[in-house]
Amino acid sequence: DYYYRAGVDLTKITEIPKLMPIVNAKPDSELLSDLDATAAWAKSQGGDTGRLGIVGFCRGGRSVWEYAAHSSQLKAGVAFYGSLIDPPNPLWPKSPMQLAGDMKAPVLGLYGAEDQGIPPAQVEQMKAALAAAGKTAEFHIFPGAPHGFHADYRPSYRKEQAEQAWGEMQAWFRKYKVLT
């Protein structure tokens, strides 16, 4: 697990306010290095990195955008409600919005219309920035869905939207040959 280096078993933390300081203390440089190492390890084990894809939720969704701007090996990504605009932070030097012009892989962004942290207006900003840069991305903003609509262990779970989003993710990965 990426966060295990913090010395804490994140599976034992059930309160988001206790979890986020640990999650947010990880620098982008370490994340990208770890993802590169994971892809290299998969290749060394016989994995077909010609079909390399990434999916993430919340902070992991942000990581999808970051890795799509970083890796020329990546074939496609899917970001479930990943943040697009970050407050200034030396650990995260650029937000996904600032990296729009650097995207190297197509990304599908799946967001909730009722997300209090990532309002639809931000999603539209990202969509416009990517289009202006000539990058490939699609977005779906799900009506009635809050942040975390795919987390079936939380009150934010929305079964219908989660199932639809999962199907869209699979179709996206098939389109870009990550899945067959």
Region annotations inferred by a language model:
Residues 1-180:
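N-terminal cap/leader regions of alpha/beta-hydrolase-fold enzymes
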